Amino acid sequence: MEQFKGLQKSLYIWTDSADLDKRVEQLKTATGGEVAVENVHRLSFSSYANSSFDLIVIECAQLTDNYVKLLHMLKPSGKLHLFSFIGPASSLLQEIKLSGFINCSEGTDTLTAEKPGYETGSSARLSFAKKNASALNVWKISGDDEELIDEEDLLDEEDKQKPDPAGLKVCSTTGKRKACKNCSCGLAEELESEKQTATASENAKSSCGNCYLGDAFRCSTCPYLGMPAFKPGEKVQLADNLLKSDI
């Protein structure tokens, strides 16, 4: 007990009342301070405040569920001392470490541990979290003297003119009306439609042979209906909509 000399307030947790006064007196003599006494079975019902003791001594007990409570009852850097304990020392050391104690050491039938030098749940500022002073100064720059730019001045008269829809097609940039291989602007479909119309016009033939004489000799479905008479064999250009279905 000489290593605990000078500790002001201690708690002695007992299991056997025989010679209890003698053991408590020995602890008082060793520490030179005040000693409180508590039964191990009544510890869970006690109402000790946090950071109340510099030293807690446990006699002949294995407190599986109360080591965390003892950690709160100790002051920062407070000591926990077990002697004549029950069970293997390795198991007790593991339970004590998992409860938050540090600097655990094993002696002859004794175990000693220490609470960290800070209060449970406390926080500390991290050194690498310092903010760059130059970055902070950027936000201090005053913008009162800055003039706002008129949005209308950013556009020229040419920018305000509407573009030609034909020029918006990607394929028209080549100068010749030719669709790209993977055309997606619609020019390929447009050229294909014009090609089919022209082919149909070239292949248009008269079934009755009287189309060139005029409307008086033409059928009701004649593609030349409404057109003036023409010479036999003469090439006549039909309108695009004449060869398309009305449905």
Curated annotation (Swiss-Prot):
- Classify the source by domain of life: Eukaryota
Compartments where located: Cytoplasm; Mitochondrion intermembrane space
**Pfam families membership:** Anamorsin_N, CIAPIN1
Please list where the region (Fe-S binding site A) is annotated: 171-185
Q: Which UniProt keywords apply?
A: 2Fe-2S, 4Fe-4S, Cytoplasm, Iron, Iron-sulfur, Metal-binding, Mitochondrion
Chain span(s) of sequence motif Cx2C motif 2? 219-222
Q: Where is this region: Linker?
A: 129-160
Q: Give one GO molecular function term.
A: 4 iron, 4 sulfur cluster binding
Where is the segment annotated N-terminal SAM-like domain? 4-128
Main localisation: cytoplasm
> What residues bind [2Fe-2S] cluster, as annotated?
171, 180, 183, 185
Q: Describe the task this protein carries out.
A: Component of the cytosolic iron-sulfur (Fe-S) protein assembly (CIA) machinery. Required for the maturation of extramitochondrial Fe-S proteins. Part of an electron transfer chain functioning in an early step of cytosolic Fe-S biogenesis, facilitating the de novo assembly of a [4Fe-4S] cluster on the cytosolic Fe-S scaffold complex. Electrons are transferred from NADPH via a FAD- and FMN-containing diflavin oxidoreductase.
Write out the domain note.
The C-terminal domain binds 2 Fe-S clusters but is otherwise mostly in an intrinsically disordered conformation.
Q: Which family does it belong to?
A: Belongs to the anamorsin family.
Among PANTHER family, the record links this protein to: ANAMORSIN (PTHR13273:SF14)
Subunit structure as annotated in this protein's UniProt entry: Monomer.
Stated name of the protein: Anamorsin homolog
The protein's organism comes out as Drosophila persimilis (Fruit fly)
Tell me the organism's taxonomic lineage. Answer: Eukaryota, Metazoa, Ecdysozoa, Arthropoda, Hexapoda
**Gene name on record?**
CIAPIN1
